[in-house]
Amino acid sequence: MKKITFALAALLALGVAGCATSQEPANTEGANQPAAEQAATAGAEDAVAFTDDLGNEVTVANPQRVVACMGSFANAWELAGGTLVGVSDDALTAEGFAIESPDVATVGDFTNVNLESIIALEPDFVIMTSGTGGRGGDSSQVDLREALVSSGIPVAYFEVTTFDDYLRLMRTFADITGDEAAYEQNAASVQQAIEGIKSQVPADEAPTALVMTTYSGGTRVQSSGTMTGAMLADLGVRNLADENRSLLKDFSLESVIELDPDFIFVIPMGNDAEAATAALNEATAANPAWNSLSAVQNGHYVTLDPKLFLSKPNANWDESYQVLYDTLYGQN
């Protein structure tokens, strides 16, 4: 009797085991997938595709090793919630940019960034400017695109002149970082403040103005196609350089005196702002007719802070608008 009982028990045990092994296997796809493939799969899910300002299609996936080759772009990337491993020199030396990423390396001056330094940082995303070097140079970061792409490094080119350009840049950056709160704080709220300032512009006033950047070697006049010129246009100002295009190439005090604008805005440029301002003051002092200008007599000859009107003000763009509005209309 005991033998029969033991036999039945053994058969039952085998039956249970058979049922267990006949069940569908657990989903072990993720566990058996190599780590590199898992990372690639996760990256594909986080990938963001966009068109840069040169018309290039760019795709990046949650980049963690980002190099920004212009100070304002480095600042904007951090404002959008990103971190950096490399920046151009001006990101660390120019006033107004407080780079917070730890142990960030430099890749050279933005007018002539070093390709080898960039690649050595093993970036997974490089942010570059589509403009030329400036400062009288003709270098271009666009020339480095082929080398970066052939090295498997995603690179995007941007050009920011107006606030709308900055807003578009921040939208792209925030889409990549996924930090919508950062976009709201450092872009959308700034836009709201600017719209509030613009809504206060008197409809029946259109003051005339000239904007000049001065450096130790001379002076240049800005049109409405520049950063400060665009802000003035938004605030109802008539830029006389738009109507007298020769001023953009050949600046002369005599032309300014003849036009007699209501406002003259001066932006010191270069490493030595004091020397730049002194050069212009010396030139104006030598011309007795300068003091007869309406802008000079009415206290409307204004030197603007380069942090707000030469470098891109980014999250402080509304402050730039406010300074101009107060100068134009706040003292009336």
Predicted segments with their positions:
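Acidic/His-rich segments in extracytoplasmic proteins that coordinate ligands and/or metal ions
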Residues: 89-176, 255-258, 262-264, 271-282
